[in-house]
Swiss-Prot record:
Its EC number is 2.7.7.-, 2.7.7.108. It catalyses: L-seryl-[protein] + ATP = 3-O-(5'-adenylyl)-L-seryl-[protein] + diphosphate; L-threonyl-[protein] + ATP = 3-O-(5'-adenylyl)-L-threonyl-[protein] + diphosphate; L-tyrosyl-[protein] + ATP = O-(5'-adenylyl)-L-tyrosyl-[protein] + diphosphate; L-histidyl-[protein] + UTP = N(tele)-(5'-uridylyl)-L-histidyl-[protein] + diphosphate. Mg(2+) binds at residues 241, 250. This is Protein nucleotidyltransferase YdiU. Its cofactor is Mg(2+); Mn(2+). ATP binds at residues 82, 84-85, 105, 117-118, 168, 175, 250. It comes from Aeromonas hydrophila subsp. hydrophila (strain ATCC 7966 / DSM 30187 / BCRC 13018 / CCUG 14551 / JCM 1027 / KCTC 2358 / NCIMB 9240 / NCTC 8049). Pfam families: SelO. The active site is at 240 (proton acceptor). Nucleotidyltransferase involved in the post-translational modification of proteins. It can catalyze the addition of adenosine monophosphate (AMP) or uridine monophosphate (UMP) to a protein, resulting in modifications known as AMPylation and UMPylation.
Length: 475
């Protein structure tokens, strides 16, 4: 292998060269072997990965840089953020010709670290590693995780933890905040070059900045629709955490819902619920408005407005498609919004587990008794009778065969979900040097729709005693 460096060489004014800093007593904890194979990196030895991600030693062709960007954080503009603890090491060309960033998080201080130490802790590194691969397996666009390295280096957060690094990968880590930085720092003349870079390397099928923005709107709308259908709350939807490629980016205090709570907040630094689950679609639009403002003067204003006007329609169209599939419905009917709304009201009112309900709903047949496994989830089954009868009538109108429908529903309603309690158990074991629980959970999450009876204990509801719904931004 030999890395290439188009970002560093073509956009040198958008980054600063920085060497990764070694960790104290690093240890290789996990390699994502399947993904390494897809990217053509199987020839790199475990020793070389440890040397790179733990000891700060270069891979062939590596030119590490920290990228500069800005961002709106909780509604307020921060004019200079950038990679405060992550480095773009270079880009790997995969066997299929695609190009992938190698991005090392926890690599040490950079010119953009401000008051931070440039490190990541094992806890947050495990959470990012698991979440990125879990979302990928669910079909949600995301950065991916390649290598996890732990260490004996003390890192000070709310308490003393140990440092770690994650080598993550994506076609690009370009963010809304990259455009904002140059727009509002008196360097607007750089934006055409940034647009040109995106068009040449990531959107060659598009003609200009107007088409680029329209595609960013479309991808963002579809991404957030997928989050909503999956019950995934990102937690920190600042514009510096929004991908120009429509990827899930920067896993902090994220969370999947358990019981259906529409205003679920997973970040204890968000007491006002700005980034609550049910606010994500509106925040996506707000963030796109900020991107449009940064592009104004470089992209036709009417084209920007026209693209923004399509956001809600695109999001709702895709979300409706996803939810119909989850309910095993093949065609659209005019009353579908009512069916969905009444379901969500019941789920919220009765605290029913979102994922288990949808999985077990696939056992409903057009005739006969209601599945015992489904009724066991419902604290007041009688309250559900009206909705279940309406649902069964809907199935009868479609005439779908029960077994076929169940197979289709199982293929979109996961049995295995990255619940916070599961992640916490894995983290606690890893902090004691036991990676076996991590390996089991990682493997199960690779195939979330399969039965996998050998991992059955990982498919149970979040325990009632677990109250860890909100998490810290510290990582």
């Amino acid at each position: 292998m030999k890395l290439i460096n188009t970002f560093a060489t073509e956009l040198p004014w958008a980054c600063e060269p920085v060497a990764p800093q070694p960790l104290h007593a690093p240890a290789l904890l996990h390699l994502n072997c399947a993904l390494l194979g897809e990217l053509g990196l199987v020839a790199v030895s475990e020793a070389d990965w440890l040397a790179c991600c733990g000891h700060g030693q270069p891979l062939p062709g590596m030119q590490p840089v920290a990228q500069v960007y800005a961002g709106h954080q909780f509604g307020g503009y921060s004019p200079r953020l950038g990679d405060g603890r992550a480095l773009l090491l270079g880009e790997q060309q995969a066997p299929d010709g695609s190009r992938w960033d190698l991005h090392l998080k926890g690599a040490g201080k950079t010119p953009f670290s401000r008051f931070g130490d440039g490190r990541a802790v094992l806890r947050s590194s495990i959470r990012e590693y698991l979440a990125s691969e879990a979302l990928h397996a669910l079909g949600i666009p995301t950065t991916r995780a390649l290598v996890l390295v732990g260490s004996q280096e003390p890192v000070y957060r709310e308490q003393v933890e140990t440092g770690a690094t994650v080598l993550r990968t994506a076609p690009s880590h370009l963010r809304f905040g990259h455009v904002e930085y140059f727009a509002w720092s008196g360097q607007g003349e750089r934006i055409p070059a940034l647009i040109d870079y995106l068009l040449r390397h990531h959107f060659p099928e598009l003609a200009d900045g107007a088409e680029l923005f329209a595609e960013v709107v479309r991808r963002t709308a579809r991404l957030i629709a997928k989050w909503q259908a999956a019950g995934f709350c990102h937690g920190v939807m600042n514009t510096d955490n929004m991908s120009l490629l429509g990827l899930t980016l920067d896993y902090g205090p994220y969370g999947f819902i358990d019981a259906y709570v529409p205003d679920f907040v997973c970040n204890h630094s968000d007491p006002g619920g700005r980034y609550a689950l049910d606010q994500q679609p509106a925040v996506g639009y707000w963030n796109l408005q900020k991107l449009a403002q940064a592009l104004a003067g470089h992209v036709d204003g009417d084209a920007l407005a026209e693209a923004l006007a399509q956001y809600e329609h695109q999001l709702m169209l895709h979300y409706s498609e996803l939810m119909r599939a989850k309910l095993g419905l093949a065609v659209w009917e005019e009353d579908d919004p009512v069916l969905f709304r009444e379901l969500f009201q019941l789920l919220a009112a009765h605290g029913v587990d979102y994922h288990l309900f949808l999985r077990r709903l696939g056992e409903v047949t057009r005739e006969g008794a209601w599945p015992a496994s489904l009724l066991a989830l419902l604290p007041e089954p009688a309250a559900w009778q009206g909705w279940l009868e309406a649902y069964r009538a809907r199935l009868a109108r479609e005439g779908s065969e029960d077994g076929v429908r169940k197979g289709l529903m199982d293929a979109v309603n996961p049995k295995y979900v990255l619940r916070n309690a599961l992640a916490q158990r894995v983290i606690e074991a890893a902090e004691q040097g036991d990676m076996a629980p991590f390996e089991r959970l990682f493997t199960a999450l690779q195939h979330p729709y399969d039965e996998q009876p050998e991992y059955e204990e990982l498919a149970t509801p979040q325990p009632a005693w677990y109250c860890g719904g909100e998490l810290s931004c510290s990582s």
